[in-house]
């Protein structure tokens, strides 16, 4: 059993870096572990123009410590009225790496999202033509659909018809949580991929209610039954190039998590890579770890893999209860892998 693994420097294909003071608090945690990151556009107001994306990218780079090599990859927030020309300009100028589809009111800051997929077909046609990936929060918002069934319903009702209408469109089904999503992506062609978070590999829905209401485990999509968690673990560790790393790290102040109407999101950036490594180790699949963290994502986005390497060591360490005042995923738990030469708690 190896006590050390070396991998090509990884990327994170789904992050929420927030803005303002929260951006200053969290960006270095992503930048210390990942060389590139796909940055979600659900700010207030959302990032819907090239100029807004450029300005947000500038703020991210200004907040990132100068000694870290980190490239934020910006995304456009799709609305019912967004212009195809705006997306094409941003993509061709290298400002937009992808566009994000939020069904209206599906998750945090998604009120301005798309209400009717047919209405944005001209946008999707443009994206397919220029090779711009579509990133999807794949849940229906129909209140009659149980929250635990909303991902499976989205695939059947919306994703499959969308892909039939736009067969050449590159699509990432983000933060998948169900066995149905695993099966759908596994059986699809090269134009469809999926990201998987560390928390959905570690917890099932029981975690939210263990001994009380555990708001730190509340995220969207919500964690599902144990059978779905096991399907995700098999997919992530399989070596299938359709699946790659996307943490969906989503920090919130404690007052926003612990309230009568708490926010969805798990802040996992500080120890995400170590969290993934533990899963691959437990599944006896460390030989596929580098592909999931460092190769499959760049291949899908048609970007070169990073050139330098990082090393992880088998070393038990305690995850702190708080990091910069925020509760990290695995708070108070012991992880069995650590990035070499990195302190157990990054001081920023």
UniProtKB/Swiss-Prot annotation:
The keyword Metal-binding applies. GO terms for cellular component: cytosol. The modification N6-carboxylysine is found at residue 100. Zn(2+) 1 binds at residues 14, 16, 100, 248. InterPro entries: Amidohydro-rel, DHOdimr, Dihydroorotase_CS, Metal_Hydrolase. Binds 2 Zn(2+) ions per subunit. Its EC number is 3.5.2.3. Catalyzes the reversible cyclization of carbamoyl aspartate to dihydroorotate. Substrate binds at residues 16-18, 42, 137, 220, 252, 264. It comes from Synechococcus sp. (strain CC9605). The active site is at residue 248. Pathway: Pyrimidine metabolism; UMP biosynthesis via de novo pathway; (S)-dihydroorotate from bicarbonate: step 3/3. It catalyses: (S)-dihydroorotate + H2O = N-carbamoyl-L-aspartate + H(+). One of its GO terms (molecular function) is zinc ion binding. GO terms for biological process: 'de novo' pyrimidine nucleobase biosynthetic process; 'de novo' UMP biosynthetic process. PROSITE patterns: DIHYDROOROTASE_1, DIHYDROOROTASE_2. Keywords: Hydrolase, Metal-binding, Pyrimidine biosynthesis, Zinc. The keyword Hydrolase applies. Belongs to the metallo-dependent hydrolases superfamily. DHOase family. Class II DHOase subfamily. Zn(2+) 2 binds at residues 100, 137, 175. This is Dihydroorotase. Its cofactor is Zn(2+). CDD domains: DHOase (cd01294). The gene is pyrC. It comes from the Bacteria.
